[in-house]
Amino acid sequence: MKIIPVILSGGSGTRLWPLSRKQYPKQFLALDSQKSMLQETLLRLNGLSNIEGPIVVCNVNHRFLVAEQLNEIDVFDSTILLEPVARNTAPAIAAAAFNVIQQKREGKAVLLVLSADHLIKDIKAFHKAINIAIECAKHEKIVTFGIVPTEANIGYGYIKTSKSEKNGAFKVESFIEKPNQITAKKFLEKDNYFWNSGMFVFQPHVLINE
């Protein structure tokens, strides 16, 4: 199936102030390499098969900055969707899905939703997880990516999964918003709780029908 990356780049990056500012938030900064976090997000998709032009969802004030950074890495076939005001991720993802359907790009395509400010080192494992997710999405599933927790972090949401694995994936039992310290420690002791990465794979019509 075709893969249409959807890059969520609307964050304000206020937690990294003063390095990250409202008009120049962290996703546009080069923090771990000579490329910005937005650019790295797209470049780490190199090597995957059937990648289509990406959709970048961003704040209206950042539209020219996004276009400039995409041009710098030779991404010329992109779509930039503008948010007049910052909202949470759900409306941004829905807008991207509607755009794909309206532009008649949906046929045999999945959306790969990624945040523009993630740091991912193990690209091989990342690509493997994406390919597993695509196989699941072919069966009209909405797939999310969990991260194995390394500490009882209360800054992340968590995913509770079933114990049984099927084709490299687990069934989601529930999503838990940021827990308190005691609850986070309990999650860390179990093997079926993961940090919610905010990354997804699905067919556009499946999300809209939800």
Briefly describe each language-model feature range:
Residues M1-I7, T14-P18, K22, A30-S115, ...:
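Conserved N-terminal catalytic core of the sugar/cofactor nucleotidyltransferase
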Residues I7-S9, V57, L112-S115, T144-V148, ...:
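Short beta-strand segments
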Residues S9, L45, V100-I101, A133, ...:
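Generic helix-packing signal
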Residues K26-Q27, G157:
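Extracytoplasmic/periplasmic beta-strand context in beta-sandwich domains
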Residues Q27, Q69, V75, N131-A133, ...:
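Residue-level signature of transmembrane alpha-helix interfaces in integral membrane proteins
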Residues Q27, V85, N196:
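Generic anion/oxyanion-binding catalytic loop in active/binding sites
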Residues I120-E210:
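Conserved core of the sugar-phosphate nucleotidyltransferase
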